[in-house]
């Protein structure tokens, strides 16, 4: 039987012409190509199901290059992306306590350790001082993967410290909100953070300093009922879910079916709840421009 040897492969006469190499043209081995493609970890877009490498999605600010879906962004990645230069991280001295000795299916300290291992963070809020387009500012971001971005005493401590430093330095405060609400494991102490953060925001406003909130997916509960809805300007990312109680809870309470876009950023924009929806790629310039106008900067 006649056989051909091309590029290290043994080809029989029965090999289809589509699989035969063309003289002068080198074709990469299919298995090697697939192996090279998947040597780097990939992320599947929840909207179009495209596989995108972590490097590519990170470079694109966690926006799917195929369908433009805004994927969830980790708090530290978001702040490092937002600032041109980070000066300092705030509130690292605060650590969670367990005064209620709370236990559900497991003790609260065990849940905290699991969240810290999962995210690499010590709490659900990260606050930083930095600059954007030449303007110094303070920004904080919720880490949703840390117990659903829930607000406990340390989240309140860090937010208040960020607001106080903003007043001291005469700088604007930006908050990227993403939370399921107050942290039930801390009971009334977590609910008190709604009042604490609201009071800190009022002091910021009394000082004549801007407070801009960026509502990312999702924002619910006590965070919505306090610091997330007290901004001078509310920006939402596309398709973000924003509300107090979730859609399912509301439907079970009122015994009615709610329309599909309910609580979506676009629906809330149409009803005057948020001021604008901004694509993530335009967010830095939008915030920079708003801060310059609100602070009468050149």
Curated annotation (Swiss-Prot):
Keyword Lipid metabolism assigned: yes
Annotated cofactor note: Binds 1 zinc ion per subunit.
Domain CoA carboxyltransferase N-terminal: start-end pairs: 41-298
Zinc finger (C4-type) stretch: 45-67
GO cellular component, one term: acetate CoA-transferase complex
Chief subcellular location: cytoplasm
Database matches in InterPro entries: AcCoA_carboxyl_beta, Acetyl_CoA_COase_Trfase_b_su, ClpP/crotonase-like_dom_sf, COA_CT_N
Intracellular or extracellular location(s): Cytoplasm
Catalytic activity: N(6)-carboxybiotinyl-L-lysyl-[protein] + acetyl-CoA = N(6)-biotinyl-L-lysyl-[protein] + malonyl-CoA
Entry EC no(s): 2.1.3.15
Job description of the protein: Component of the acetyl coenzyme A carboxylase (ACC) complex. Biotin carboxylase (BC) catalyzes the carboxylation of biotin on its carrier protein (BCCP) and then the CO(2) group is transferred by the transcarboxylase to acetyl-CoA to form malonyl-CoA.
NCBIfam families cross-referenced by the UniProt entry: accD
PANTHER family membership: ACETYL-COENZYME A CARBOXYLASE CARBOXYL TRANSFERASE SUBUNIT BETA, CHLOROPLASTIC
Protein name: Acetyl-coenzyme A carboxylase carboxyl transferase subunit beta
Organism field: Acinetobacter baumannii (strain ATCC 17978 / DSM 105126 / CIP 53.77 / LMG 1025 / NCDC KC755 / 5377)
């Amino acid at each position: 039987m006649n056989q051909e040897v091309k590029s290290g492969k043994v080809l029989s006469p029965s090999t289809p012409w589509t699989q035969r190499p063309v003289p002068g043209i080198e074709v990469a081995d299919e298995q090697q190509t697939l192996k090279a493609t998947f040597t780097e970890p990939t992320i599947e877009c929840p909207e179009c199901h495209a596989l995108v490498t972590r490097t590519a999605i990170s470079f694109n600010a966690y926006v799917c290059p195929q369908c433009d879906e805004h994927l969830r962004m980790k708090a530290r990645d978001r702040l490092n992306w937002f600032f041109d230069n980070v000066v300092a991280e705030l509130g690292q001295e605060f650590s969670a306590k367990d005064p209620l000795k709370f236990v559900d299916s497991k003790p609260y300290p065990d849940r905290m350790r699991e969240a810290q291992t999962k995210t690499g963070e010590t709490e659900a809020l990260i606050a930083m001082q930095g600059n954007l387009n030449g303007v110094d500012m303070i920004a904080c971001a919720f880490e949703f993967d840390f117990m659903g971005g829930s607000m406990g005493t340390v989240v309140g401590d860090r937010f208040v410290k960020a607001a106080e430093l903003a007043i001291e330095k005469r700088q604007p405060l930006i908050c990227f909100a993403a939370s399921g609400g107050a942290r039930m494991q801390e009971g009334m102490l977590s609910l008190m953070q709604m009042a604490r953060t609201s009071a800190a925001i009022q002091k910021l406003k009394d000082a004549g300093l801007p407070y801009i909130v960026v509502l990312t997916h999702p924002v619910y509960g006590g965070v919505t009922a306090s610091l997330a809805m007290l901004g001078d300007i509310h920006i939402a990312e596309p398709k973000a879910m924003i509300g107090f109680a979730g859609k399912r809870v509301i439907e079970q309470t009122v015994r009615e079916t709610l329309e599909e876009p309910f609580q979506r950023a676009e629906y809330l924009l149409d009803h005057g709840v948020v001021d604008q929806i901004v694509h993530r790629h335009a967010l830095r310039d939008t915030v920079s421009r708003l801060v310059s106008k609100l602070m009468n900067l050149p």
